[in-house]
Amino acid sequence: MARTPERRVRTLDFAQFCHGEPSSSHGFCRELVDCLRSLGFVKIRNHGISGEEIEKVFVMNKLFFSLPQAAKAKAAHPPEANPHRGYSYVGQEKLSRVKDYEKGKRSIVDVYDIKESYDQGPAVDKLYPNRWPDKQDIPGFRVVMEKFYERCHQVHQDVLRAIATGFDLSPSFLTDLCCENTSELRLNHYPGVHPSSLRKGAKRISEHTDFGTVTLLFQDSVGGLEIEDQNSPGTYFPVSSERKSDMIVNVGDCIQRWTNDKILSTSHRVVLPEDRDALIKDRYSVAYFGKPSRSQLVSPLREFVKEGEKPKYSAISAWQYNQEKLVLTYGGDEEILVPKPSSSVCTGVGQLQ
């Protein structure tokens, strides 16, 4: 797949939305939607999460993945898709299997992803409790992670309000679809490797789209993140961060489905450096994956389907959609069980049946 260095992801100031005058706030929302429509990605500064908070979670990121394998395995993700919590070793996930999911295709070739990860949900989730490492192995880990999760949850809600406002909808239009908190926070570590040890076709993460609403990403300066140019399918260009506090926001599949492709979930990947003469450095990132309520449908909403236009997606719950992709990612054929809706699950807004 080709690469092009010409394109750039725009950077917006979130303070305009949170603290600006009404005209400035609304202008930000329109520009945000324009960025997401054109690239599916945007960088945001002054988002409300301090540099100190971000640095703390990166410290915990490095500490966790530097633990002995036996210590990380105490919080192990199961071999199958569920519960999607805890530590996944290098090669356990295979995102190449879900690359063409929306096209009704399933990849028969597994691409080896060179990363390990740790997944966490909300502090209270009766269906999927979090899996924590032992306190004595990494003191303070749980406190830092739970606090950072809550900070990201707040920003996720604000971003959804800004997107809705940019479409001239009620600010709560999208947050009403996410009233049950099921989002996930992930630590990623891409181990340093010597080029001679790499498998053919290996990537740090294969081409994929994110499953949920929007993703909030923080990354170090090592580089490697690339996104697909929507005007030139198959062509990717790099997205770097000048500092860890830069928050990269990208649209997930659920927003694409709700808007009937008015905003697209852009394919992205993490590649290895082209110059492989020396040891390839470790890379670290932190991602918050916003998710809808589990019982919420992720089919097109009437607010985004013009008269005479057909919905492009059939009705499916956010839960089932997420599970189908997870089962492919972890390589299992387990049955997808739909949970009973909790009393807090919202009923949906303007859903086309």
UniProtKB/Swiss-Prot annotation:
One of its GO terms (molecular function) is metal ion binding. Binds 1 Fe(2+) ion per subunit. GO terms for biological process: small molecule biosynthetic process. Coiled coil: none annotated. Residues 181-292 form the Fe2OG dioxygenase domain. Fe cation binds at residues 208, 210, 268. 2-oxoglutarate binds at residue 283. Its cofactor is Fe(2+). Its EC number is 1.14.11.-, 1.14.11.57. Disulfide bonds: none annotated. It catalyses: L-proline + 2-oxoglutarate + O2 = trans-4-hydroxy-L-proline + succinate + CO2; L-proline + 2-oxoglutarate + O2 = trans-3-hydroxy-L-proline + succinate + CO2; D-proline + 2-oxoglutarate + O2 = cis-4-hydroxy-D-proline + succinate + CO2. Pathway: Secondary metabolite biosynthesis. Keywords: Dioxygenase, Iron, Metal-binding, Oxidoreductase. 2-oxoglutarate-Fe(II) type oxidoreductase; part of the gene cluster that mediates the biosynthesis of pyrrolopyrazines, secondary metabolites showing insecticidal activity. Within the pathway, ppzD converts L-proline into trans-4-hydroxy-L-proline as a major product, yielding a key precursor for peramine biosynthesis. PpzD is also able to convert L-proline into trans-3-hydroxy-L-proline. Belongs to the iron/ascorbate-dependent oxidoreductase family. This is 2-oxoglutarate-Fe(II) type oxidoreductase ppzD. The gene is ppzD.
